[in-house]
Amino acid sequence: MANNQELNIIHLYPDLLNLYGDRGNIACMQKRLEWRGIDAKVSTCTNSDHSINLENADIIFVGGGSDREQEIVCSLLLKKKDEITNYVENGGVLVAVCGGYQLLGKYYQTANSKIEGLGILDIYTDAGDTRLIGNVVLESELFSQKIC
């Protein structure tokens, strides 16, 4: 490797949150880093091994799952809420896609229940009549350009 850099990625619950092939997002990150001469070391936190060490984490990745799996993961993450919140508030990078982002909000409402989120983001999600799938473009006063 050209410059001996390493990036530590923690993939949270890939065994439960992989509804739309989110392992592919990790593979894509690894490849794009490789092209830049950066090794990506991926650690996982799974339903059978709940250990998370954020001390050396450069990126935390959370994918999406069905309501059932997201509810399981949310209950597990709530036990680590302070640790994850401190990580983010101290400049840690957390990438959440699909339903994974709803876990970061105050709550998300499913067809049957209201699930408490981590409250890291000041958002909430209400289930609609139809499932929305596709790309999102955001604009915010915090950023000078659109976020895709």
What are these regions (language model features)?
Residues 20-21, 27, 132-136, 148:
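A broadly tuned "polar low-complexity/structure-edge" signature
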Residues 67-144:
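Cysteine-nucleophile active-site neighborhood
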Residues 1-86:
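N-terminal beta1-alpha1 cap of cysteine-dependent amidohydrolase-like domains
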Residues 4-7, 142-147:
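Beta-strand-turn-beta hairpins that frame and shape the catalytic cleft
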